[in-house]
Amino acid sequence: GGSSGSGGAPPPTNPPVLKAEAFRFLNQASFGATESTASALIGLGDNTNSYSRWIDAEIAKPASLLNPAVEAAFPNPVPNGFNIASLNNVRVEKWFENVLRGNDQLRQRVAFALSQVLVVSQVGALQNLPFATADFQDVLARNAFGNYRDLLREVTLHPAMGVYLSMLGNQKAVAGTNLRPDENYARELMQLFSIGLVELNLDGTVKKDATGAPIPTYNQDIIEGFARVFTGWKWDCPSTVTTCTFANTRVQVAPASGYNQVKPMRLYAEQHETGTKRVLSYTGATLANATIPAGQSGDKDLADALDNIFNHPNVGPFVAKQLIQKLVTSNPSPAYV
């Protein structure tokens, strides 16, 4: 005989995290799960709180940085024939050390995802600026869990981005000549870093007009408006001098206290375009007539421009979808976004 009932205690209301689930989560939230990290996650609680506890602990950890190691590798005195571009190898080696052995795994994972959105490259103009490129990645690591508006400002004014997308040294127009503000950063900031080319629904799907065509987010007039915002910014004064101008400021090649390769670009008012600037128009935009008024300071123009971009309804779905693709799944559903 015997009973056919299930018997025994009922299953726990909140079961523990399964080992396979822990590995899957850590393979997305770090640079690879191990037996020890999976066990530590499982030991934090059941499947309702262990993940949040792990994430909270990761957020509290300080960033593992790159540039201190690159600075330490700079020789003193500098030998004949020293190639400063070789320090890019130090940055890469330190990056691998941080992501494979660093304690701040989630921060490094998110910073890596951000580096695939907010892109600079050591190839070309940045090849001989290894401290700027290392510090740029450090900016992403420090801001990995912060506000995207704050990060956009740091990225915009970072010399690595300034050199890479030619905002550094961008000059105002000169009447009677062909000299006009460089549009490179204005275009890429919108197209790649914030809103994309077409209007989106909150789930990341493309909005359509009455004819079924996608709706562009901006046009050439808006590109030119933002290009005028991004004029007048260049290297900060070298730490070895007390005053400098747009024309004579220069990059400091060697690391030193307060050196300008890792300081935000400085505004030189004499080269900032002070006229009106057309910006993005959308429901909820606060600038009258989608225009930055004439006569403002360069700092105020920059703040208004970044607010105008950051508050655009595309930013959430556009950036979120990219981060989901880098961190979780390459083809997220609209419901996921």
Sequence positions of predicted segments:
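N-terminal mature-domain "stem" immediately C-terminal to a signal peptide or N-terminal signal-anchor/transmembrane
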Residues: 11-64
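Residues that flank catalytic or metal-binding motifs in active/ligand-binding sites
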Residues: 22, 110, 185
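Active-site substrate-binding loop specific to GH73 endo-beta-N-acetylglucosaminidase modules
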Residues: 42-47, 56-63, 67-79, 84-96, ...
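Amphipathic interfacial helices
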Residues: 90-91, 101-109
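Short, flexible active-site-proximal loops enriched in glycine and acidic residues
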Residues: 106-110, 122-131
